[in-house]
Structures are given as C-alpha cells and as structure tokens.
Amino acid sequence: MLMPKRVKYRRVHRGRMKGKALKGNTLTYGDYGIQALGSCWLTANQIEAARRAMTRYIKRGGNIWIKVFPDKPVSKKPIGIRMGSGKGAPEYWVAVIKPGRVLFEMAGVPEDVAREAMRLAQHKLPIKTKFIAREEFGEKDGEADEN
C-alpha cells in the first residue's frame, strides 16, 4: 500500500478542497488516462484496488502509471475514548484530489482494452471520472462515466 516513508509532521489539518487541479491535469506518460470530475480524498486502499483491477484485466501487456500519491495522514481516536487529550493517531493516508486531476495513465494496449480496464478501475473510486486519450489518438476527451 502507498504511504510516505517519513513525514515532517505526523498530524495535519484537514484543509479545504476548492478550485480545480492546476498541476497533473494532462497526460504525461501514457496514451490513455482517468481524469477526476469531482473532488475527494482518495485513500491508499482505493488507489490499490483500482490498480489491481486494471492490472488484472490487461494481464501482461501495457504499462500503468499511478499519478497520485497519498501523502496526507488522517487521524482517528479509538472507539470508547472520551473527547480531549490531544489529536488521535494517524489511521490511514489519503491523496487530495481536485477536479481535472489525472489519476492513472496507461500505454501499450489497444484503446478498447484500455477503456475497459479503466472502466473497471472507475468502479473502485469514490468520485465521477472520465476516460481521456491523447489528441493524436483521435478524440481528446471521452464521455463522462457515472462512477
């Protein structure tokens, strides 16, 4: 599972997710990708589940790039503990996703295989996403999927 090796601060504020993604909103490595249409916290487990779904479908062909990294710790206090006495221990790690962010990229497979693999991965994610392709492969942006 993805998580940082070491961090400067163990606990961080929740922050706000406003605006669009200014970085990471274009395809850089692959020919096809999944682009976020909404904002969310994407957990390390969700990223891994989507990666496994794509990898198992394309079998040995093609490359997959994960373009997001969960670098934000989310803390949680144990059940049955009274309020106060500081912030809880880090429970899991999330990546902050804004609209327009490319989550995964893929290359080395035909478009129909990439589209189906990305569709399987989209079902593992908590936000609406869309399939995108490079300009030289015909269409620029695919249609929006429900999940």
Curated annotation (Swiss-Prot):
InterPro entries: Ribosomal_uL16, Ribosomal_uL16_bact-type, Ribosomal_uL16_CS, Ribosomal_uL16_dom, Ribosomal_uL16_sf
GO annotation, biological process: translation
UniProt keywords, alphabetically: Ribonucleoprotein, Ribosomal protein, RNA-binding, rRNA-binding, tRNA-binding
GO terms for MF: rRNA binding; structural constituent of ribosome; tRNA binding
Transmembrane segments: none
GO cellular component annotations of the record: cytosolic large ribosomal subunit
Coiled coil location: none
Family statement drawn from the similarity comment of this UniProt entry: Belongs to the universal ribosomal protein uL16 family.
Function of the protein: Binds 23S rRNA and is also seen to make contacts with the A and possibly P site tRNAs.
PANTHER family reported for this sequence: 50S/60S RIBOSOMAL PROTEIN L16 (PTHR12220), LARGE RIBOSOMAL SUBUNIT PROTEIN UL16M (PTHR12220:SF13)
Subunit structure: Part of the 50S ribosomal subunit.
Stated name of the protein: Large ribosomal subunit protein uL16
